[in-house]
């Protein structure tokens, strides 16, 4: 029994340790975000609300059936009679019950029909806004995810630089003790080491800040993330021209589709406002029965009534309200037209900017790779010169800083390239989960 209990505890401990230490990849973080991000959930709720609004607008054109029942009692005290017989004081009472069933149906109402069309278009627009929120989430998750990795890389470089400077500080102290260098070199190395210690503190805080930023999207703290595989990482220059991407964006960019829908809705709003000048026709049928019970009466009078009719309403003058509503709708249409023009310009700029950034990142990446190689060679040469007395400790410290700055720039460029590629796809409206899946294949367990 003790062995079984011990085995169970060990198994639970191992499982717990495995769960805690297991790193999350980009897709796992994204899936968590899709279920918890307030922005996406809000967009989904708004899409649901617009779908219900469409159903409500449709209900205006469907038959309406209602039932009404009323009950009343009447008590009367007073004199009754005529001049021949005289007046006699008496009391009477009665009660009545009336039930009415009414069916109504809109036969013609241009405003209601226009309202249904507008509701349908707004429902489709809200679905597009939901899709846009999902695309934006892909970029935000990638930004937050790789920002954490970038800050972790920076912390690693800062710590490596600190260790290198610490080693150089110890060597400088030893050289000073045997008279091979001046005390100023020791002070210079100590100053650089102190700076590296401060940089490490700042870098550690940046890591936690980045993790917290990611948590605001997913609602969960991510302690360990898969890292970018630098051994297999490569950049690819776009095979199409920027004008080709612009053409795709004009057809598929979600923000542009939303703006176009707003213009279309604004046009329909003009028609709905003008519908106030047109007559409306409605159908109504009702059936009612009434039952009256009078005290002392021999019978119970009952009456049944059936009514069927059409109601025509013709607007003649409404104080200028309809014309004012039409003018307002036309002004809103002009505003929507300007929004569409602005959206077209913004999307063109976004595509060109993202395209140029990707092209620049590809070229810069190759240059930074060479910069790291050159910085490593420069540091080796400077350290050799310091050993023979032709270079100072200041030169060594500068070369050390240059090397880790080059490594840091190269690492940051990798993340920048990935994000630039995603933003280009977002600008063209082609961004999807499949893009994250492709990136996720280039990750390794952190």
What does each model-found stretch correspond to?
Residues 3, 136-248, 354-357, 361, ...:
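Periplasmic alpha-helical coiled-coil/stalk elements that build and connect Gram-negative outer-membrane
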Residues 41, 64-84, 89, 93, ...:
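Small/polar (Gly/Ser/Thr/Ala-rich) solvent-exposed segments
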Residues 42-57, 133-157, 167, 174, ...:
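Amphipathic alpha-helical coiled-coil segments
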